[in-house]
């Protein structure tokens, strides 16, 4: 795994994949230590980017309130060390972290508590003097006010300095924050660049690919997957966002620290005043978008499917209940690839289908993405979500006319008479490929593009129910609560007595690997769908298969 994973290493004390969690998790571990009367040190390391997430400050606030021994190391790698400030702060950190200084400080503090008069005034004066001295040199007053002893900033590449500071502060019985400054990619030639150039290069290392034979089962290794020249859904979104902005002045784009990943770099450069990166704060991003929508602005929130989970309450209470037309472009829905189980967008269909008034869609290609986004901008009284994978968009013509699609409308891509496949998103092309192969075997397969996951096309469903005794649903999302569940529920109530097979992600956390590898293993590629159809054809029983 490219992230912390408890099952992989004893040194991964707790799993992680989403940002801003280390302080809260570390505090829980520290309190477990106290509850179990055990003796060890706990240190939570957090990056400066993760400090944009509210969860980090929730943890800091709680730790400061508890006031027990706990160390937070803030790794700040977005700023260089000024020689003057670095020297001053290093000296000051050595001073205030020195055990002798802290012992004298604590004894003097206790002594002032015994003063017969002016005890509180004296202590307040001492605290203000120390804070003023810190304020001249270090940015630590905020953490002091939250109940932490602040040390730093120090050079994180000066190993001797880091070790001596840790030795000095390890026995302090209160919460401590050590601020270290580092340079991202230091020592790696390709990353020793400045500003955005090196940041964009470093972003490539966010997804750590599986290593060696363990990542390539025999049934996968023999397959050669060729890269296609067509744009990705992320490329398409980048172009669409700019196209829409040129034609509509009331639109803005929002992302949560994923400008490059979502394809919003061109938009951010062409429309900087209409581009908002809210940081690792998805909940804030959704409520922020709701505020914009409440005043007539049309916000398009481009957020990874897995990260949008963090904003679920905000989607319901700040957006859907208030009938606000926020557009959610859910990037990396389905299999996210090498980032693994913490990043697969497997749950969005299930967790959005149950939100009242939410429209849930999935384009089969870039052109349909264009039409769905245009349609979303014409909905003024409810949220509209568009899910798409990290994959090729198959077809995209940015010169054609945008079409307004009827809400809840499906599209029959191929007529058939023996089996009906109801496919979601790019799975339509998998279904069409298999339909052609089955046609050569004498089995007629109908393929329906279910671009509207919610609301469903009830007229089309009724037509399918009346004409077919074998139906397959296929989606790149979890089966439980997914599109197939919606179809099976409707068919059951409508009295369907044939066979229904739901294909999707299983009720387990899917491990990492390339999208093609994982889809093959899960039976969601052409070979897997072909086998499902053949098994269904061989099974002569006309029974429910829910």
Language-model segments: residues:
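Cofactor-binding active-site loop characterized by glycine-rich and histidine/acidic residues
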Residues: 1-66, 251, 255-256, 264-265
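Conserved thiamine diphosphate
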Residues: 3-6, 31, 35-41, 87-162, ...
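A short, small-residue-rich loop immediately preceding and capping a beta-strand
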Residues: 12-15, 38-53, 70-73, 251-254, ...
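A glycine-rich helix N-cap at a beta->alpha junction
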Residues: 65-79, 320-332
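Long, well-ordered, tryptophan-enriched scaffold segments
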Residues: 77-236
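Glycine-/acidic-rich phosphate or pyrophosphate-binding loops and their flanking alpha/beta elements
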Residues: 164-167, 206-207, 232-247, 263-269, ...
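Non-catalytic terminal/interface segments that mediate subunit docking, oligomerization
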Residues: 182-308, 314-324, 402, 406, ...
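Peripheral docking tails and interdomain loops at the edges
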Residues: 212-227, 337-339, 359, 478, ...
């Amino acid at each position: 795994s490219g992230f912390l994973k408890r099952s992989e290493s004893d040194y991964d004390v707790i799993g992680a994949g989403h940002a801003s969690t280390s302080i809260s998790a570390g505090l829980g571990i520290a309190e477990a230590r106290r509850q179990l009367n055990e003796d060890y040190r706990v240190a939570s390391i957090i990056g400066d980017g993760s400090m944009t997430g509210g969860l980090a400050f929730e943890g800091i606030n709680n730790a400061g309130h508890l006031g027990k021994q706990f160390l937070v190391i803030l790794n700040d790698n977005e700023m260089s060390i000024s020689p003057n400030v670095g020297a001053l702060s290093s000296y000051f950190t050595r001073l205030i972290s020195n055990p002798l200084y802290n012992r004298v400080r604590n004894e003097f503090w206790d002594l002032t508590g015994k003063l017969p008069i002016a005890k509180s005034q004296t202590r307040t004066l001492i605290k203000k003097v120390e804070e003023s001295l810190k304020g001249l040199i270090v940015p630590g007053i905020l953490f002091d006010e939250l109940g932490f002893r602040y040390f730093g900033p120090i050079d994180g590449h000066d190993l001797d300095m880091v070790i001596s500071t840790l030795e000095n502060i390890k026995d302090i019985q209160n919460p401590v924050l050590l601020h270290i400054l580092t340079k991202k990619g230091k020592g790696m030639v390709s990353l020793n660049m400045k500003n955005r150039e090196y940041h964009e290069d470093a972003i490539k290392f966010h997804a750590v690919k599986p290593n060696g034979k363990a990542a390539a089962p025999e049934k996968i290794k023999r397959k050669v997957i060729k890269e296609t020249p067509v744009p990705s859904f992320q490329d398409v979104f980048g172009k669409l966002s700019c196209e829409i902005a040129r034609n509509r002045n009331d639109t803005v784009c929002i992302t949560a620290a994923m400008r490059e990943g979502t394809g919003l770099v061109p938009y951010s450069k062409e429309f900087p005043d209409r581009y908002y990166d809210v940081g690792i704060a998805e909940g804030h991003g959704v409520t922020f978008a709701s505020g914009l929508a409440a005043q007539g602005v049309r916000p398009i929130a481009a957020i990874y499917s897995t990260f949008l989970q963090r904003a679920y309450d905000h989607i319901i209470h700040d957006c859907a209940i208030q009938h606000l037309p926020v557009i959610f472009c859910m990037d990396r829905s389905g299999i996210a690839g090498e980032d693994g189980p913490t990043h697969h967008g497997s749950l969005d269909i299930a967790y959005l289908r149950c939100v009242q008034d939410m429209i849930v869609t999935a384009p089969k290609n870039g052109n349909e993405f264009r039409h769905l986004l245009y349609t979303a901008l014409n909905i003024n009284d409810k949220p509209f979500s568009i899910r798409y994978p990290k994959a090729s968009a198959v077809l995209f013509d940015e010169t054609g006319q945008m079409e307004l699609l009827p809400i809840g409308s499906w599209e029959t891509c191929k007529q058939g008479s023996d089996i009906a496949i109801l496919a979601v998103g790019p799975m339509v092309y998998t279904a069409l490929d298999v339909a052609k192969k089955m046609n050569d075997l004498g089995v007629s397969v109908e393929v329906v593009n279910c671009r509207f996951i919610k609301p469903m096309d009830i007229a089309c469903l009724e037509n399918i129910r009346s004409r077919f005794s074998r139906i397959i649903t296929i989606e790149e999302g979890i089966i439980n609560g997914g599109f197939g569940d919606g179809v099976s529920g409707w068919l059951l109530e409508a009295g369907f007595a044939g066979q229904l097979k739901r294909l999707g992600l299983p009720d387990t956390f899917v491990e990492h690997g390339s999208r093609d590898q994982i889809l093959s293993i899960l039976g969601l590629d052409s070979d897997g769908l072909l086998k499902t159809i053949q098994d269904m054809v061989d099974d002569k029983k006309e029974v429910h298969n829910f």
